[in-house]
Swiss-Prot record:
SUPFAM superfamilies documented for this protein: Glu-tRNAGln amidotransferase C subunit
A Pfam match: GatC
Lineage top rank: taxon: Bacteria
Stated role: Allows the formation of correctly charged Asn-tRNA(Asn) or Gln-tRNA(Gln) through the transamidation of misacylated Asp-tRNA(Asn) or Glu-tRNA(Gln) in organisms which lack either or both of asparaginyl-tRNA or glutaminyl-tRNA synthetases. The reaction takes place in the presence of glutamine and ATP through an activated phospho-Asp-tRNA(Asn) or phospho-Glu-tRNA(Gln).
Protein name: Aspartyl/glutamyl-tRNA(Asn/Gln) amidotransferase subunit C
GO molecular function, one term: ATP binding
Family named by the database record: Belongs to the GatC family.
Catalytically driven reaction(s): L-glutamyl-tRNA(Gln) + L-glutamine + ATP + H2O = L-glutaminyl-tRNA(Gln) + L-glutamate + ADP + phosphate + H(+); L-aspartyl-tRNA(Asn) + L-glutamine + ATP + H2O = L-asparaginyl-tRNA(Asn) + L-glutamate + ADP + phosphate + 2 H(+)
Taxonomy of the source species: Bacteria, Pseudomonadati, Thermodesulfobacteriota, Desulfuromonadia, Geobacterales
Subunit-structure text: Heterotrimer of A, B and C subunits.
Taxonomic source organism: Geobacter sp. (strain M21)
């Protein structure tokens, strides 16, 4: 499957991306390479191959949740450049 420049432009519009002419050319080539690779993968005979989610056997690495103590407010704010009472103070980012 060969991807066209028009298809790349369409995908860019859907993603609300403004691409330059050079970027369109670059992405058209890159997406074409990716689709060619996927076509090769689709052509592989995987009959009789057991589906796996990991290439190597893995066991659940989760640990049990255990409640532990936390540091106090003063220790948490010890190195804060700005603070207001018991809170971190940060620059305003929304007008």
């Amino acid at each position: 499957m060969k991807i066209t420049r028009e298809q790349v432009e369409h995908v860019a519009r859907l993603a609300r991306l403004e691409l330059s002419e050079a970027e369109l050319d670059t992405f058209t080539g890159q997406m074409d390479s990716i689709l060619s690779y996927v076509e090769k993968l689709n052509a592989l005979d995987t009959e009789g191959i057991v589906p796996t989610s990991h290439a190597v056997p893995m066991e659940n690495a989760f640990r049990a949740d255990e409640a532990t103590g936390s540091i106090g407010v003063e220790a948490a704010l010890a190195n804060a450049p700005l603070r207001a009472e018991s809170f971190f103070r940060v620059p305003k980012v929304i007008e």
